[in-house]
Amino acid sequence: MDQITITFPDGKTREYPRGTTGLDIAKGISPSLAKRTVVMALNGTLTDLADPIDDNASIDFVARDDARALELIRHDCAHVLAEAVQSLWPGTQVTIGPTIENGFYYDFFRNEPFTPEDFAAIEKKMREIIARDKPFTKEVWTRDEAKKVFADNGEAFKVELVDAIPEDQTIKIYKQGEWFDLCRGPHMTSTGKIGTAFKLMKVAGAYWRGDSNNPMLTRIYGTAFAKQDDLDAYLHQIEEAEKRDHRKLGRELDLFHFQEEGPGVVFWHAKGWSLFQSLVGYMRRRLAGDYDEVNAPQILDKVLWETSGHWEWYRENMFAAQSAGDDAEDKRWFALKPMNCPGHVQIFKHGLKSYRDLPLRLAEFGVVHRYEPSGAMHGLMRVRGFTQDDAHVFCTEAQLAEECIKINDLILSTYSDFGFEGELTVKLSTRPEKRVGTDEMWDHAERVMATVLSEIKAKGGNRIKTEINPGEGAFYGPKFEYVLRDAIGRDWQCGTTQVDFNLPERFGAFYIDADGAKKAPVMVHRAICGSMERFTGILIEHYAGNFPLWLAPVQVVVTTITSEGDDYAKKVLAALRKAGLRADIDLRNEKINFKVREHSLAKVPALLVVGKKEAESHSVSVRRLGSDGQKVMPTDEAIAALVDEATPPDVKRMRGAA
């Protein structure tokens, strides 16, 4: 019998008969290894343990507590969910049930939609199915056989899915006891390996294949983990996230609102606009001296977007309009800009550029508009009109590494200043199959960025985690993505550094090199916050509305115990505002405890309480948000302390360096 060579994680090899399964190999090594293994990684790809191995391969046995098994726990749980539903409600049709971030879902077709009240019964049935510990077994059916079986079972959606499978692919059926489903796999060895650390989370409506012309399905979302402690931690995070929801806090703190007449665009209230402007002001200070701030038009002729490629590749996401009026010669199509980059190339092209002018760094807080389906919009996190803290660096190839390092340092220090001191991930996405530019250009850019990534890791120490995403770069160049972690452990992708070989050449942008030749610059797209609206939403949730003093829309409120302190309170207010603090006053004839509670709910960081005694001693009673105590201080001393605390971190650094 033919032999194959299997390579193990320690580099050792062993010969086996062709067709040996992963389970056979595991049993031959150790019965305990076979017992704890749920799937194998064959040449790095998770594969059913019972699959025969026909060629030389590397193998790694994956146990249930391995991080790689988590997706399978969730995938298998989705299958158990589907079996439970069909067991409880015969006649329900199952459609698709993929894993998603933090869980899974399954879409069902039933005349009466499911509700959260059904979850208890479904979860009970799921636990019964898991306890039976039925093995997952794979069968390969012919296309006609699969269609006939599903049609006979009244599973019209499955018949459609079989038809959609390419002719060169096999039809795989996975069974768990008597129940079976169409699935690509892989799966763990049995339902018992799923465990009981799962929970159904919510229901939603979803059109079949995402098309509103198709039937409406009921989507049941769930989550599953290897351990109960992990599930409990996740559920706590969800509970905490609901408390911190920026949409809820936006209403409670009077920051912003949305309404039907302006879907996906923000109505900023005074306090919210103050927060937004604090963010913009910070970014402006960080750019001063290194970047030229510019402003490109918001609406431009479609000719420009045709040249950039957006009209061909991004048209469905753009807002376009034809010019008004009856003049036929003036009838032109325009589009609101979805991105700032084409406008910045026009500014670069205006006037001859020499290599001595590079790097040229152009920054803009540009308002862009992109179409998002109404169902995809989510508060500040996903809107149709937003502001980008966009910048584009035009440089030579030799300058690329230094510019990427400078951008990285700016991004990391910015996140630290805003309180994101936890783990941060920097991902390098490399060339996709379809791309512009020569292999030599990509080789150079990827070498540079890989070197930069190593330097980022070395400088960042334990705080920085780095990853490489092969084939995930844009068609016009490799990129870095920055993923920060918030106060409750959620990850947010915000910053990007994107190399672009394409756009300068499309627009014929060039500089004169040292030898007098025209040369296209390397263009680096850079964003730190990304969408300023989204970053504001992240800040709201990160701080749960309890902003540090330098960011708080209202930093301090002066309030009185009785009307005897009104005149003195007004003098204190004037002194606070003269010192540059965002201050307000509360002279209402209400009990002081009522006022304190109200301003605490409004998350005002500092209250200065004054009465007759404070007026006579030129002092204030300082109450801080989250503290039950108070401290009596001379007014000048209290104001000086607040001014120091309200000084933005970047300004403090500049003063310290002066």
From Swiss-Prot:
Family from the record: Belongs to the class-II aminoacyl-tRNA synthetase family.
Keyword list, A-Z: Aminoacyl-tRNA synthetase, ATP-binding, Cytoplasm, Ligase, Metal-binding, Nucleotide-binding, Protein biosynthesis, RNA-binding, tRNA-binding, Zinc
Listed name of the protein: Threonine--tRNA ligase
Cofactor binding, per record: Binds 1 zinc ion per subunit.
PROSITE patterns: AA_TRNA_LIGASE_II (PS50862), TGS (PS51880)
Listed InterPro entries: aa-tRNA-synt_IIb, aa-tRNA-synth_II, aa-tRNA-synth_II/BPL/LPL, Anticodon-bd, Anticodon-bd_dom_sf, Beta-grasp_dom_sf, TGS, TGS-like
Subunit structure: Homodimer.
Origin species: Rhodopseudomonas palustris (strain ATCC BAA-98 / CGA009)
PANTHER family: THREONINE--TRNA LIGASE, CHLOROPLASTIC_MITOCHONDRIAL 2, THREONINE-TRNA LIGASE
Signal peptide (from-to): none
Record bears the keyword Metal-binding: yes
Molecular function via GO: ATP binding; metal ion binding; threonine-tRNA ligase activity; tRNA binding
Annotated region (Catalytic), positions in chain: 245-548
Localization terms from the record: Cytoplasm
Binding site for Zn(2+): C341, H392, H525
Main location: cytoplasm
Cofactor section: Zn(2+)
The gene coding this protein: thrS
GO BP terms: threonyl-tRNA aminoacylation
